[in-house]
Amino acid sequence: MESLQVLVVSMGRKDLSLANKMNFDCSAIIANQTDRCDYISERREYGLVEMYSTDTRGVGVNRNIALAAADAEFILFADDDISYYDGLKRNVLKAFSDEPRADIMVFGVDIVKNGEIAERRRHKDRERRIWNSMRFGTCVMAARREAIERNSIIFNTNFGGGCIYGSGEDSLFLKACFDCGLRVFSSSYVLGTCSKDASSWFTGCNEKYFFDRGALMGYLFPKMPHLMALYFAVNFKKETDIRCKKRISLMLAGLRAGKKLIPYSEYSTEEST
């Protein structure tokens, strides 16, 4: 059994050249969404690199494909815009060795924009609770595979890039981990750089964004979704031209729609008629 596998989600890949760009030093599984279904692999000096290509869509589906194929003791979730610093395997395994209570480990990352580091996301070595973990993205998380498998935890396929609702699969995954009693820790180790020059799915904090966040609140906070939707809309700090009253309206509409998995496209059509 491998000690660590990197589980990468990507799109439109034709070969394994992504492995060189990402600079991992352990076995890896690339889940590649494209227009074909096939499998290729290559044994390298540091481990086996595999790519499962499917004609599926949605980041949650893609992550679940990689997760189902994994067989290592520890798994590190990844996006294809990360480039790891040297010593990845050694440092990830050390983090779990230093904190044997951890089922999930969250790491730091340097955010790159226009070729320069624009933000350094750092964490202290500490245990996390659900209320201070919802901002962590999947691509900085590692896990004990057995803990995930034992509790049948998978990614929600209705949230995230390419899905009905544009984001939130990472928060829902972490919530599922907490709900199952898994323990989440953060590490001071920094994985590498993550390029944020462009996104294939994020189109800004527009009306769809708030609608989708409203739908997410119903799944993240089922006991108090209206309160959390109101809190998010009122305290929103990012740049947007949408006024607070409209943000609240959109989030409450999304909250209602999320119960029936109604997308923003249907809501916006009804609003315009």
Labelled PLM ranges:
Residues 75:
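Short aromatic/hydrophobic "clamp" motif used to bind/position activated sugar donors
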Residues 116-146:
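Short, flexible, basic/aromatic active-site loop/helix in glycosyltransferases
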Residues 54-70:
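Glycine-rich, basic loop-to-helix element that forms the pyrophosphate-binding segment
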Residues 205-214, 218-273:
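Non-catalytic, C-terminal membrane-associated alpha-helical segments of glycosyltransferases
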Residues 87-120:
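Conserved donor NDP-sugar-binding/catalytic core segment of glycosyltransferases
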Residues 155-157, 181-193, 205-206:
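Catalytic beta-strand/loop signature of glycosyltransferases that borders the donor
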Residues 160-172:
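Acidic donor-binding loop at a coil-to-helix junction in glycosyltransferase catalytic cores
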Residues 1-29, 40:
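N-proximal low-complexity "stem/linker" segments adjacent to membrane-targeting elements
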